[in-house]
Amino acid sequence: MRARSHPGEGFRIFEIALVIVFLLAVIAALFVNPSQGIGVVEARPSNETIQAYAYAMPAAGWSPLTVHFSAFGSASRLGRIIRYEWDLDANGRYDTDATDQAGYTSYMYKKPGDYTITLKVTDGQGNVATDAVTVRVRYPGSSSVDYWTVFDDSQVRRVELRITQANWAAIWQNPSAKKRVEADISLFGETLESVAVSTKGNASLEATPNEKKSWKIDTNYFIPDQEYRNLKQLLFHNNFADASLLREKMAYDMLAFAGVPAGHAAFVEFWIDIVDDDQPSEYLGLYTMVERVDSKFVGNRFGRADGIGNLYKADAQPVTGAADLAYYGENIGSYPRPRGADVAYGLQTNLEQPDYRGIINLCHVVDGVEYDSPQAFAAALEQVFNVDGYLRYLAVIFTNLNLDTYPYTGNNFYLYENPTTGKVEFLPWDLNNSWGHFGGDATFPLYGQPCCLGPLQWAPLFTRVFEVPQYRQDYSAYVDLLVRYWFNRPDITQRVAGWQSLIGPSLTRSTGDKMYVGPGAMFTPQQFTQDGLALISLTADRADYLRAVLDSGAWQSEIPKANTRPVLIP
């Protein structure tokens, strides 16, 4: 949590020593651990004349790391702020004057480490306030996976699956069964033998009308401990129903920009070689290769010194329930089971000793207690949950209109019990429905709408978090930074043009991408270009709407209440 510091009155110590002691005690009560990166939730004392708020985006990442800063919400009761100064390199000096930019500035951190960055604001009466935010820069070599080689997104590389006719036919007997069969795979010129290949997906698997399904490769299914550059599973998504092919990739990039722990993604061309049919390799089309959320993912983001904590994958189905983060008691057996035997929070790690106490405790804090005030709820929540990470996630999904997740459908996310902090982390997943593909338009409200669009009928975390005034401000500050530096017409135009230039040739490679050419094609190559232009238009309109809301001060309003609590169907 970010520490808020307040201006002193300049009294001489020898005159009011007892008063100073009292004031220091009060101020100390407001200080919290700065490494968490969120604001305190206590209401601003009535005798404060000036308040500073410092925000960073991202607040953590791999070096070299460019961070954008804002003083969103900083204000004086005696007039406007006339000076914004930053200590951006943590050297103790305010050597960056951002007054001309109303407090906005940027800085690149090349050296790994934790930096305490301080903002100082001054009003026309000479009153001063400061605020600090921590930026954590990680060394790429500390990762167990060379992400920058495996997920090199500066080029489109070739992946070729080499499989027998019998095994290929076995997949197509029932694609929905996701049967694993043996094959070899060439990844960017490097071959792995005897991997397991299977289809993946749910709705997209059923609806894709040709062989361009999404694929999952398990490297160690037939050969124990076999890995590809320290990865055991490789995922290739077909970008079903996205004519632009860009939604998922750009959504992951946007999350990374916001400082949300999200997977890497890169474009590849996927080929199939039936090794015993005397025919050349067949081109399926362009895919997005996406990093899997697993023990290595969380270890590389949150560390391994204290072991790997419990990782849960959220699930949802109509009628039978969803991962709603509601409290159903102390027995995990009482919680929703969307697919019958499996609980909505599917344990992915530490399977030898299944333990759901962390999830139950989080649900209890979120939904099982009546609090005296939003501030009391916030104090309890921050003991068990990384609120700042969740607010950054919400800022991204409500800005780019990805409604196929919490707080609407109740799936497409993970929860991780971080053993280092003792808090639960919220991790996004499956982002192909971003940019309004699952609903929402340019004027979708800043704080969203009452849930729900699918299986989820009750989203207490969504409702309660936005009842806290400080959280609404922090969230709005993150939306502001996104709109200013990433989600706007100039930046998105450059991104769409760059990606389309890179991947456009892959649509007509060989016999053509099966999503665009041949039997079962869902789009035309012209729609690829048109949908990219539509993404630009939606982004521009959405950014204009959000900017108007932020500038008007309407961000201080509360969100609509969620629907009533559901009754589980056995």
What role is predicted for each listed range?
Residues 6-19:
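N-terminal Sec-pathway targeting helices
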Residues 34-142:
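Extracellular/lumenal mature domains of secreted and surface-exposed proteins
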Residues 148, 156, 167, 171, ...:
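Middle-to-C-terminal accessory/interaction subdomains
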Residues 258-271, 405:
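Short, well-structured beta-strand/strand-turn elements
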